[in-house]
From Swiss-Prot:
Keywords carried by this UniProt record: Cytoplasm, FAD, Flavoprotein, Methyltransferase, NAD, NADP, Transferase, tRNA processing
Protein name as catalogued: Methylenetetrahydrofolate--tRNA-(uracil-5-)-methyltransferase TrmFO
InterPro entries: FAD/NAD-bd_sf, MnmG-rel, MnmG-rel_CS, MnmG_N, TrmFO
Keyword Electron transport assigned: no
Function: Catalyzes the folate-dependent formation of 5-methyl-uridine at position 54 (M-5-U54) in all tRNAs.
HAMAP family: TrmFO
Enzyme Commission (EC) number: 2.1.1.74
Swiss-Prot/TrEMBL catalytic activity: uridine(54) in tRNA + (6R)-5,10-methylene-5,6,7,8-tetrahydrofolate + NADH + H(+) = 5-methyluridine(54) in tRNA + (6S)-5,6,7,8-tetrahydrofolate + NAD(+); uridine(54) in tRNA + (6R)-5,10-methylene-5,6,7,8-tetrahydrofolate + NADPH + H(+) = 5-methyluridine(54) in tRNA + (6S)-5,6,7,8-tetrahydrofolate + NADP(+)
Principal location: cytoplasm
């Protein structure tokens, strides 16, 4: 007999979303979170869904992959995206949040939900198979539970090294050098920009690649396995003299009006900086600023010394230094069904970054699907998968046994995947223009999801609760 209370292990983005979906379907949830009793190298608080890396969910526009994923989540009343929208901060064309208010609100909302029981302890083993369970422990799953998961699956977990960027006090920067602008003047001037000339750039790069690294278990800078979309800044610097200028330090599309006429070619070539470091608001007031793209494993003393070489940051005061940590994830295509159930146990679901999705919205998407299906299983109803044409559906296909290449061939190495239009099926009528093609993907997805949502709503008819977000 199945226990009707669903257990969700981990109150990160995926776990919070799963718990919300389950509780709002009228099913009792026990949400288990080990913090603050047992924290991780990357966490600083005991709040739910603490954003340990960037405070950005990616592009807002629905004709971008990340933006489409956000819009799909809004369609299904995602707690994560609704809360992100509520506590958003200016970030040009991206959805960025005040991470403190975001996490506190999620904690309060779920703690106040009548169908959610919060349990603060470290889960040391997988619950009994009679318990419907959502495993949403994230990339920083505790060692003991990770060992039990390995024993259950019979497969070693994969890993990569991830890092967080430093945060500095906004009133410690030099505003005579730093200027406000968004790339290509899109939206409000949401970023602060630190221009760097050629000589300063080369001196800065030299300091970066020779900076002393923090010691980290199993980490060797010569052989470490990184996630390519979130490389440490010193690793980017090591890959080539100009590599940073084509990544987080690119200056294209950024211009300070004090430099004169942008459209005067001679002036533009003379005044354009060799590189630019961008700072993004962590809160509405701009009291805290994130160094965009500056994930790092440098020692804290080295971060202070080297990052103060950046023009405008000579007297920067650091709220938080960057840190690196080891991220663990499952070889999901060999373990999961498209419903996010484990092949070996129908009552056990997995969701979030532990499944090999990358990005905050993708983690929420996994929690959304796992939560919906855990609810359906508890109600003895048929489980669902999202349409292949949707970003949610295509991501879940990639991390499940529908990904035939990854699930059947030992030679291919499974790596985390963010939202990408490369995952969705081709259009019936091919469109060469990229912008028009992406727009067509968006329209097709949202149209398919409206049909899917009607079917799903019928499954939950008379069951759903209307609970407001704090």
């Amino acid at each position: 007999m199945i226990d009707k209370q669903v257990i969700v292990i981990g109150a990160g983005l995926a776990g919070c979303e799963a718990a919300w979906q389950i509780a709002n379907s009228g099913i009792a949830v026990k949400l288990v979170e080990m913090r603050p009793l047992n924290s991780t190298p990357a966490h600083h608080t005991s709040e739910f869904a603490e954003l340990v890396c960037s405070n950005s969910f990616g592009a807002l526009s629905a004709d971008r992959a990340a933006g489409l994923l956000q819009e799909e989540l809004r369609t299904f009343n995602s707690l994560i995206i609704q809360t992100a929208d509520k506590f958003s901060v200016p970030a040009g064309g991206a959805l960025a949040v005040d991470r403190s208010k975001f996490s506190k609100s999620l904690t309060q909302t779920l703690s106040a939900h009548p169908f959610v029981e919060i349990s603060r302890f470290e889960q040391l083993d997988l619950p009994n198979k009679k318990n419907i369970t959502v495993l949403a422990t994230g990339p920083l799953t505790s060692d003991e539970l990770a060992t039990k998961i390995k024993k259950f699956t019979g497969i070693d977990s994969c890993h990569f090294f991830d890092a967080a960027s430093p945060i500095i006090y906004g009133d410690s920067i030099n505003h005579e050098i730093v200027f406000k602008a968004s790339r290509y003047d899109k939206g409000d001037p949401a970023y602060l920009n630190c221009p760097i000339n050629k000589l300063d750039y080369f001196n800065f790069r030299n300091a970066l690649i020779n900076g002393e690294q923090a010691s980290l278990k199993d980490f060797d800078k010569e052989s470490a396995n990184f996630f390519e979309a979130c490389l440490p800044i010193e690793e980017i610097a090591r890959r080539g003299i100009e590599t940073m200028r084509y990544g987080p330090l690119k200056s294209i599309g950024l211009w300070n009006p004090n430099w004169g006429d942008l459209f005067d070619r001679e002036n533009r070539l003379k005044k354009r900086p060799h590189a630019i470091v961008q700072l993004r608001k962590e809160d509405l007031e701009g009291k805290l600023l994130n160094m965009v793209g500056f994930q790092t494993n440098l020692k804290w003393s080295e971060q202070k010394r080297i990052f103060r070489m950046i023009p405008g940051l000579e007297k920067a005061e650091f709220v938080r230094f960057g840190v690196m940590h080891r991220n663990t994830f499952l070889e999901s295509p060999k373990l999961l069904l498209p419903t996010l159930q484990f092949l070996k146990r129908e009552t056990l679901f997995a969701a979030g970054q532990i499944t090999g999705t990358e990005g905050y919205a993708a983690a929420a998407a996994g929690g959304l699907l796992a939560g919906i299906n855990a609810s359906l299983l508890a109600k003895n109803k048929n489980l669902v998968t999202f349409p292949n044409e949707s970003m949610i559906g295509s991501l879940m296909n990639f991390i499940s046994n529908r990904n035939e290449i990854m699930s059947n061939q030992k030679k291919n190495k499974f790596q985390p995947m963010p939202a990408s239009f490369g995952l969705v099926p081709e259009l019936t009528n091919k469109i060469k223009d990229k912008k028009l093609r992406y727009k067509a993907y968006q329209e097709r997805s949202l149209k398919e999801l409206q049909v899917f949502k009607k079917v799903l709503d019928a499954s939950f008819k008379n069951d759903q609760l209307l609970v407001e977000i704090n």
